[in-house]
C-alpha cells in the first residue's frame, strides 16, 4: 500500500466513526497530547479569524505562533477544511 493509500485509509477510518468519543479514542491512540492541543489551537484560531478577529486579537486569545497563524489564515482563505468549523456549530 502506498503512502497516499494509507493516508486515504486514515481519512476513511475517521469518517466512519460515529461520535466524538470514538474520534477522541482514535486520536488519543494516534497522536501525542501536544499534537492534539496544536490541532485544537489551529481550529480555534481559524474560528476566530472567520469571525472577523485580527491577527493581534487571535494571538492574544490563543497560544498560536505568528508563523502558524499565517498558515492557518492562508488555509481559511484558500482551503476547504476550516470552513466546516462554522457549518457544524
Please give the residue ranges for each predicted region:
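Short helix-capping/linker segments at secondary-structure and domain boundaries
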Residues: 52-59, 79
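Short alpha-helical "recognition helix" segments of helix-turn-helix
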Residues: 57-62, 69
Amino acid at each position: 500500500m502506498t503512502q497516499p493509500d494509507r493516508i486515504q485509509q486514515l481519512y476513511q477510518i475517521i469518517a466512519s466513526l460515529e461520535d466524538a468519543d470514538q474520534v477522541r479514542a482514535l486520536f488519543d491512540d494516534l497522536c501525542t497530547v501536544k499534537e492534539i492541543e496544536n490541532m485544537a489551537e489551529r481550529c480555534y484560531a481559524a474560528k476566530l479569524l472567520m469571525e472577523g478577529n485580527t491577527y493581534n486579537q487571535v494571538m492574544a486569545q490563543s497560544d498560536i505562533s505568528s508563523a502558524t497563524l499565517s498558515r492557518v489564515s492562508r488555509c481559511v482563505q484558500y482551503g476547504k477544511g476550516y470552513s466546516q468549523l462554522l457549518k457544524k456549530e
